[in-house]
Curated annotation (Swiss-Prot):
Enzyme Commission number, as recorded: 5.5.1.-
Pfam family, one: Lumazine_bd_2
Protein name, UniProt field: Aldolase FrzH
The protein's annotated pathway: Secondary metabolite biosynthesis
Broad enzyme group: isomerase
InterPro entries, A to Z: NTF2-like_dom_sf (IPR032710), Put_lumazine-bd (IPR039437)
Keywords from the named record: Isomerase
Taxonomic source organism: Cladobotryum sp
Tagged with keyword Aminoacyl-tRNA synthetase: no
Length: 125
């Protein structure tokens, strides 16, 4: 079988990653839940301290965040197969004055791309 991934598949992966970016902008988990698998995980560093666990931790953080974050984001698909993808996001968020680098691990399940892992590092300004 030849390795071939269509541009529409890349677009679908980026659209799934934008569920996360838009959730950060809105301060609501509703949009994030459209992109993340319910059993997903999150691991990374906040203020130099390792944090990790269920993706529900991110949902709680989003729901406790005030609405109206100004976000600048750059997304790159750094690796992709027909059923897996890794997306790197560079996010600048105000307020709070924090930047993030995220690596979103995705799997295509029943024809739909879902984020199953978020590995991140935060950079307070």
């Amino acid at each position: 079988m030849a390795k071939h991934i269509t541009s529409s598949e890349y677009d679908a992966v980026i659209a799934t990653a934008y569920c996360y970016v838009e959730a950060m902008e809105k301060g609501s988990s509703k949009r994030a839940k459209e992109g993340f698998h319910p059993d997903g995980g999150i691991y990374g560093y906040v203020d130099g301290e390792f944090k990790g666990g269920s993706i529900s931790n991110l949902f709680d953080f989003l729901d406790q965040s005030p609405e109206g974050h100004k976000i600048k984001a750059h997304l790159d698909v750094i690796a992709m197969t027909p059923t897996t993808a890794i997306v790197k996001t560079e996010v600048e968020m105000n307020p709070p004055e924090t930047d993030y680098t995220d690596f979103l691990g995705m799997v295509k399940i029943d024809g739909k791309w879902q984020i199953v892992s978020k590995i991140f590092h935060s950079y307070p300004r």
